[in-house]
Amino acid sequence: MKKTICILLVLVSLLTMALASCNDASDVSENDVSVGPQAYVPHLGETTAYQGKVLTILSSHEEHNYSKEAFSATEVTNEPINDASYNRNIKLEENYGFKIETIWEDAGNFMNRVRDDKAAGIDNYDVMVSGLQTLAFLAAEGFFLDLNSLEDSNLQLDQPWWDQPFNEDMSVAGKLYFATGDIVMLDDEYTRCILYNKDLIEDNNLESPAQLVYDHKWTLDALYEMARVASHEGDGDGKMTVTGGDVWGLVQASFESYTLILGSDCPLVSKDEDDIPRLAMMDARNVEAFEKVWEICTDRETTAYTEQWYSWNAPDAYKVCENFQKGQSLFYTITINAVSGKGLREADIRYGILPIPMYDEEQEAYCTTINPYQFHAVSIKENCKDVDFVTFALEALAWTGKEYITPEYYERTLKNKRILDDDDSAEMLDIIFSNRIADVSICYNWDDCIQYYNRIFSAGDGGLASLVESEQDQFNFEMEKTLEFFTKD
């Protein structure tokens, strides 16, 4: 009897193992679509075609935080972003056989370096990474390939590791000469935002501006009303100054007037169905946004911007915005990178971060914009001899950036280390980066249009219509020269 039971138990055990084996085989066939180990960059597959190759990048802004970490980490430092970048580069070499090298050039000399290299026949880099306006100027001189019409390209610019809204903003007549996304970090670092002083919010019994954001009520009117409540003469001399004890509602540089207008979703240009820009400053909504921002920025009892007190390059110009770091301003318009700066690191204030306010509550979404001088993008040289390899390497860098670098930069470092003591800022950052506008006109800077609003605010005359009337012919002339160059073939 015991023998019979043992035999039955063995048979049951064998049957169970067989069924489990069948189930395991079914799981593999249904869920594992790859044969053998998955490629390091899955959509690029496995290949030995690039063994021994080197992707050489000419880049600027070496001194900026997270510039070198994008491509050039050379050793483990126990800094999460650097180490993720270093390990990524090692994995790319192990799996695909290519290396990445970076040549650094000062941002102020970058364009001259590129022009001089071409004139001298120097051809020792494939890709350029620099500020957006620098790349746009070089694109207009014919230095780059159109990414939208590349043959043998491995770029998948419609994928989430590339910034599709940026591509749409930056294309002109269907041509795209630079792209950005998870391949770099200085695009996020030089995205604009507003900081606010939590103590002044509480001292003045004001509603949380973060809650206004959640409620879709963070508007220019809301900012202005709160700024007016908070601002006051504080040192007894009877006048508002930027070097005493007065408290301001808003501090900023004059350029930030345009930031507030762009927050209203009103770039200088709009584009037609053929992807051709046209000057839009006199469109009804743009005019209304300008008038509202004009009211805020010219209220000298509430708002202090740099050019009201100093020239932009004066040694003491920093004193205007320093009021925020001293706890003497409710709001401060700035770029994300400022939270790593010495001033805010050492400031004895509690602050939070906000998107740029909307024009009104009818606006569909919050909009923010960029600093076109340091916001980084990537271009391929027009005489690139190996488009297949260069685009493969850039695509691999972008995908691995999203998978391995961005989580360390955005989630672990920006949200959890650099923005401290704040329950809302992580979600505010998500809102800020969800809808970013890059105005193509100020990147190509036709007729120095980046200064249009600055000129009006610095003059103090509110002359929007007169400026447009005096400048639109030159603006159109310079824009059309660019269009002719881009479409001449």
Predicted feature residues:
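Conserved N-terminal structural module of periplasmic/extracytoplasmic solute-binding proteins
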Residues: 2-141, 404, 461-489
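Hinge/lid segment of periplasmic solute-binding proteins
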Residues: 37-53, 66-68, 106-108, 133-192, ...
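Conserved C-terminal helix/tail region of periplasmic/extracytoplasmic solute-binding proteins
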Residues: 379-391, 401-489
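Short helices/loops that flank or line small-molecule/ion binding pockets
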Residues: 111-124, 136-141, 224-229, 315-332
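Short, solvent-exposed loop/beta-turn-alpha elements that line the ligand-binding surface or hinge
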Residues: 152-160, 215, 241-243, 266-288, ...
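Glycine-centered hinge/linker elements that transmit conformational signals in sensory
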Residues: 224-227, 259-260, 266-313
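Extracytoplasmic/periplasmic substrate-recognition and gating elements
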Residues: 343-412
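Extracytoplasmic/periplasmic solute-binding protein
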Residues: 56-59, 122-128, 132, 172-194, ...
